Design a protein with these regions (language model features):
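Hydrophobic alpha-helical targeting segments used for export or membrane insertion
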Residues: 1-2, 272
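N-terminal signal peptide c-region/cleavage motif recognized by signal peptidases
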Residues: 4-6
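Transmembrane beta-barrel domains of Gram-negative outer membranes and organellar outer membranes
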Residues: 9-272
Length: 272
């Protein structure tokens, strides 16, 4: 049952609303929040593949229109009989990241919201293979959202660029890769504090920061649920299967070289 004080809340807040996308809301100056999440990825050929990344985030809004946060994350891999990957079952501390989101246009005033987001990170585990590495990268996003029906239906669009350089501890080699693509989502408030919807992401993987060599592409589409459980506590659950894709130099209707068959996320937040 939802907290009774939420029953009259109608305004849609997009700061935490989607599973794999980002909204343009950033909170109010002085807001503090802690968040926990786990992203799971599974499904590669021909054997068994599962990876999970539990994370803990602390967030603060220092000034109007600016949201800042820091995140610690771990990595777990269970890999067996996957072409090109060593069998392993391991868990380890993985990465540290810092996120800055700045809102350029406020949705309630202009009719649409516009923001930019940058999250540089350092990691010590390869997210696909679980191999020990040093990796340096960033998630850079352009964010747009608009209420199609006030306090009822909201649409969002993201454009994402994710460059990353990786240094292998095993071979000493450096690699430079990037992922680029758009994402779109729609959420409907069916009850005060409860929204359901869907997200679609079209991602292209490249070798090189300047998108020099195409490596593969994937289209993900799946449902998202947001629920405010109390005045201060919320939860998000999303599942995003790959419905189409292709890896470079490989036949088939999916890209299971650069991406997974399924991605899922569960996230909760506690506001102060």
């Amino acid at each position: 049952m939802l907290w009774s004080s939420v029953a009259h809340a109608q305004r849609i807040d997009t700061e935490h609303l989607f599973g794999f996308m980002i909204g343009t809301d950033v909170g109010e100056p002085g807001d503090k929040e802690i968040e926990g999440e786990t992203v799971a990825r599974w499904g590669k050929r021909p054997g068994s593949y599962f990876a999970a990344a539990p994370a803990f985030e602390a967030e603060f809004v220092p000034i109007e229109n600016l949201r800042a946060s820091a995140t610690l994350s771990a990595a777990y891999h269970d890999i067996s009989r996957i072409a090109g990957l060593e069998d392993r079952r391991q868990g380890a501390f993985d990465s540290l990241s810092f996120d800055l989101r700045y809102r350029l246009i406020e949705r309630q005033q202009a009719g649409f919201g516009l923001a930019i987001d940058a999250e540089p990170h350092w990691g010590r585990v390869d997210p696909t293979s679980g191999e020990p590495v040093d990796r340096y990268g960033a998630d850079l996003s352009l964010l747009l959202d608009k209420e199609l029906v006030p306090d009822r239906v909201l649409a969002a669009f993201n454009l994402v660029y994710q460059p990353e350089a990786t240094h292998s501890h095993l071979t000493g080699a450096w690699s430079r890769e990037a992922t680029f693509g758009p994402a779109a989502g729609l959420m409907v408030q069916i009850e005060p504090g409860i929204l359901i919807g869907a997200e679609a992401r079209y991602l292209r993987a490249y070798q090189g920061f300047a998108l020099e060599k195409f490596a593969g592409q994937a289209l993900f589409f799946g449902p998202t649920l947001y629920a405010r459980l109390s005045k201060r506590l919320w939860v998000i659950a999303a599942w995003s299967p790959q419905i189409a894709g292709r890896a470079a130099n490989f036949s088939g209707s999916l890209d299971l070289t650069n991406f997974e068959r399924h991605q899922a996320k569960v996230q909760f937040g506690l506001e102060f």
